[in-house]
C-alpha cells in the first residue's frame, strides 16, 4: 500500500487478504498474506517476497486509464522485470464457484520453465476441487507432458487436450469463451 492510504483503505485491504486466504484454502493452497506500507508499491512487493521467501506472487490485472498506458500497468511491469518468482496475474470477473469451464492457454516450450509442474499442479487442484472440466490449449509436446502428469497424480480431473498452432489461438479462444469460463 502507499503511505497516503487512509485507515479505511488499510482495513479494506486486510479484509480482501482474508477473503483471498479463504479462497486459497478451498483449493488446498496455503496462502500467506502480508499487509505492509511502502512508498513504492512494486518495491514493497519485491522486498516482502524476498523477506518471506515467497514462491508465488498473485497480483490483480491493472485496467488502463489511457491508451498510452501499458496493458499491465507500471507496477506489474516493474515486477515482471525485477522478480525471479512465479507471478500470477488475476482479473476475476466471475466468482470461482460460478465458473463453468477452465481454459488454459499454454505458450510454446512452457515445459522448460522452472514453474511448469507447479502451475500444472495448481490448475489440476482447481479442477478437482471445483469439479469443472479443464481445456488445455497448447503444443503437442507440452500437452503430452501435462496429460502424463494428470494421469499419474490427478486421475479424477476432467480434462481435454486441444492442440494449437500458438499464434492466433488466444484470439480464437477470446471469441469462444463465455462469461462463466475461466481463462488461465
In which residue ranges do the predicted regions lie?
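Soluble catalytic regions of membrane-associated enzymes that act on cell-envelope
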Residues: 2-42, 49-52, 56-65, 73
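Soluble or luminal CAZymes and related metallo-dependent hydrolases
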Residues: 12, 16, 115, 165
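Structural beta-alpha unit
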Residues: 25-57, 155-184
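Intrinsically disordered or low-complexity boundary/linker segments at protein termini
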Residues: 1, 55-141, 145-148, 154-157, ...
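Well-ordered alpha-helical segments embedded in enzymatic catalytic cores
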Residues: 19, 44, 118-122
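Residue-identity detector for glutamine
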Residues: 12, 19-21, 32-34, 67, ...
